[in-house]
Amino acid sequence: MYQDLIRNELNEAAETLANFLKDDANIHAIQRAAVLLADSFKAGGKVLSCGNGGSHCDAMHFAEELTGRYRENRPGYPAIAISDVSHISCVGNDFGFNDIFSRYVEAVGCEGDVLLGISTSGNSANVIKAIAAAREKGMKVITLTGKDGGKMADTADIEIRVPHFGYADRIQEIHIKVIHILIQLIEKEMVK
């Protein structure tokens, strides 16, 4: 009944991944991002992650895999997803939704920390404001974006962009794979 739809969805996902893999710059960017994160941890820094909707879930998943575990037991790494409901509702109410991430970065971000900002469109105003706040604090910035990078293009130290112009879920599928690879590489770097 739905076999053709299922095949089409899986084929489109495979095609999106194949297109991402064709550009060696993506592979190098992932490696550089992992080393940057591990270097921050080794120097006593932390990573803050943020995004909206599914990207918010990815930001939380990233932090959870770092503080908890990925595939093997190891020490936890300092990672915080900006997802505290009381913070988000307070700042959203008192300042506005566009400030929910930047206020948190202003409060706990430090020089030497890293911000991971995730936006499939690259146009999330609250993530863009978080990037600006991170810069003010002397933090490094890594972004996971899609399409043409949107307004977030060229705002990060390292941008990992999925150049897919269809539905956002295809971009998110690559983002979560990148997140898992980042964690795997961070674990390797941390034992060097």
From Swiss-Prot:
Pfam families: SIS_2. It is an enzyme of class 5 (isomerase). GO terms for molecular function: carbohydrate derivative binding; D-sedoheptulose 7-phosphate isomerase activity; zinc ion binding. Zn(2+) binds at residues 61, 65, 172, 180. The reaction produces a racemic mixture of D-glycero-alpha-D-manno-heptose 7-phosphate and D-glycero-beta-D-manno-heptose 7-phosphate. Keywords: Carbohydrate metabolism, Cytoplasm, Isomerase, Metal-binding, Zinc. GO terms for cellular component: cytoplasm. This is Phosphoheptose isomerase. GO terms for biological process: carbohydrate metabolic process; D-glycero-D-manno-heptose 7-phosphate biosynthetic process. Binds 1 zinc ion per subunit. It comes from Shigella dysenteriae serotype 1 (strain Sd197). Residues 37-192 form the SIS domain. Its cofactor is Zn(2+). Pathway: Carbohydrate biosynthesis; D-glycero-D-manno-heptose 7-phosphate biosynthesis; D-glycero-alpha-D-manno-heptose 7-phosphate and D-glycero-beta-D-manno-heptose 7-phosphate from sedoheptulose 7-phosphate: step 1/1. CDD domains: SIS_GmhA (cd05006). The gene is gmhA. Belongs to the SIS family. GmhA subfamily. Substrate binds at residues 52-54, 65, 93-94, 119-121, 124, 172. Its EC number is 5.3.1.28. Catalyzes the isomerization of sedoheptulose 7-phosphate in D-glycero-D-manno-heptose 7-phosphate. It catalyses: 2 D-sedoheptulose 7-phosphate = D-glycero-alpha-D-manno-heptose 7-phosphate + D-glycero-beta-D-manno-heptose 7-phosphate. It is found in: Cytoplasm. The keyword Glycoprotein does not apply. InterPro entries: GmhA/DiaA (IPR035461), Phosphoheptose_Isoase (IPR004515), SIS_dom (IPR001347), SIS_dom_sf (IPR046348), SIS_GmhA/DiaA_subfam (IPR050099). Homotetramer.
